[in-house]
């Protein structure tokens, strides 16, 4: 999962529109998508049915689709063999994604560029000590993992 963020007027909606045109009109759209995997836009009321019939695609969707924040969507993403690019400024608490896969979309003059939002990481737990006994149960909580 990759997340693309950005302020208004940075090209997020334009990216989705261009991908949609390329998908619907092919070469006559004037948009040339260079990618080894098919790139698809997921949107609309039938999103779940469409997603269940897509395999091995790169799927783009944006925050205009209300389903992006639902547990139902998160469950479908977790059970899918597709790669997802989600364009949103919201936190997606139901989905597991890496901070290394959050990109910002920013405009520079008349050109749009992507840049990593979080460029450095540090290890939170630097040393793992061996456990002297086998626990019967291990409880963990991670609200951002989606589980």
Predicted regions and their residues:
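Hydrophobic anchor at the beta1->P-loop junction of P-loop NTPases
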Residues: 4
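Conserved glycine(s) of the Walker
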Residues: 10-11
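Post-Walker A alpha-helix
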Residues: 15-16
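Post-Walker A helix-loop "phosphate-sensing" segment adjacent to the P-loop in P-loop NTPases
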Residues: 21-31
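Conserved P-loop NTPase "ATPase switch" module shared by AAA+ and STAND
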Residues: 47-71
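Structural recognition of the conserved hydrophobic beta-strand(s) that form the central parallel beta-sheet
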Residues: 60, 82-90
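RecA-like P-loop NTPase motor core
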Residues: 96-147
């Amino acid at each position: 999962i990759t997340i693309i963020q950005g302020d208004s007027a940075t090209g997020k909606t334009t990216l989705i529109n261009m991908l949609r045109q390329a998908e619907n009109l092919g070469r006559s759209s004037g948009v040339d998508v260079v990618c080894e995997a098919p790139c698809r836009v997921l949107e609309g009321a039938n999103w779940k049915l469409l997603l269940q019939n897509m395999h091995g695609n790169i799927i783009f969707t944006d925050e205009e689709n209300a389903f992006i924040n639902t547990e139902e969507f998160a469950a479908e993403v977790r059970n899918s063999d597709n790669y997802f690019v989600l364009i949103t400024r919201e936190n997606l608490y139901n989905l597991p994604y890496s901070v290394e896969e959050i990109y910002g979309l920013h405009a520079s003059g008349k050109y749009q560029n992507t840049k990593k939002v979080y460029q450095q990481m540090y290890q939170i737990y630097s040393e793992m000590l061996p456990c002297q006994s086998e626990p019967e149960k291990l409880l963990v909580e991670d609200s951002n993992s989606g589980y």
